[in-house]
């Protein structure tokens, strides 16, 4: 029983913390390694999924840089862990769908499988999500003035929430 406790304590103290630290270090160091590798002219002989992975990582970093330049007030509001998770998904999908042996590569060229098509569609969709321009999520709702008069409005905050955010707080007011 003491061995089980030892491994449980080892995992809690060392393994999970070092695993998390390694994932963070890999996420921080990956874009610089990819951009240094992109200047290498021998990149054309790599498989297409690895090439797409490096393009997606660079495009994802540029997306956050572009957002911070457009809106300097919200330069610290992007979610680093979301960026890290998407990078890891692209990396894992790229390596999972890459054919390593030459015999399988020749066979895959002759007979396209539906799994390969799904892999290409997933990677293309992720890459498109990373490279598309960010869209505004604010919705302009029309503010109806004149329906309610000032003496009938008891809560100005509730009216503001109802008009701007589309939240109805309280009973309906009859006109």
Swiss-Prot record:
Pfam hit, one: SecM
GO cellular component terms, A-Z: cytosol; periplasmic space
Signal peptide, first to last residue: 1-38
Alphabetized UniProt keyword annotations: Cytoplasm, Periplasm, Signal
Main localization category: cytoplasm
Location(s) in or outside the cell: Cytoplasm, Cytosol; Periplasm
GO molecular function list: translation regulator activity
Domain of life: Bacteria
Name by which UniProt lists this protein: Secretion monitor
Gene that encodes the chain: secM
């Amino acid at each position: 029983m003491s061995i089980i406790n030892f491994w449980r304590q080892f995992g809690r103290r060392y393994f999970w913390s070092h695993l998390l630290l390694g994932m963070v270090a890999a996420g921080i160091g990956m874009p610089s390694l990819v951009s240094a590798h992109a200047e290498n002219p021998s990149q054309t002989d790599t498989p297409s999924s690895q090439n797409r992975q490096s393009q997606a990582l660079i495009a994802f970093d540029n997306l956050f840089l572009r957002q911070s330049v457009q809106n300097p007030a919200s330069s610290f509001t992007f979610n680093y862990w979301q960026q890290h998770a998407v990078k890891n998904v692209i990396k894992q999908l790229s390596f999972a769908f890459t054919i390593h042996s030459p015999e399988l590569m020749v066979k895959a060229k002759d007979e396209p499988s539906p799994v390969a098509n799904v892999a290409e569609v997933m990677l293309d969709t992720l890459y498109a999500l990373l490279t598309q321009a960010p869209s505004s999520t604010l919705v302009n709702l029309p503010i109806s003035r004149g329906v309610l008069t000032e003496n009938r409005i008891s809560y100005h905050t509730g009216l503001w929430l109802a008009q701007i955010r589309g939240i109805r707080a309280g009973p309906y007011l009859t006109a």
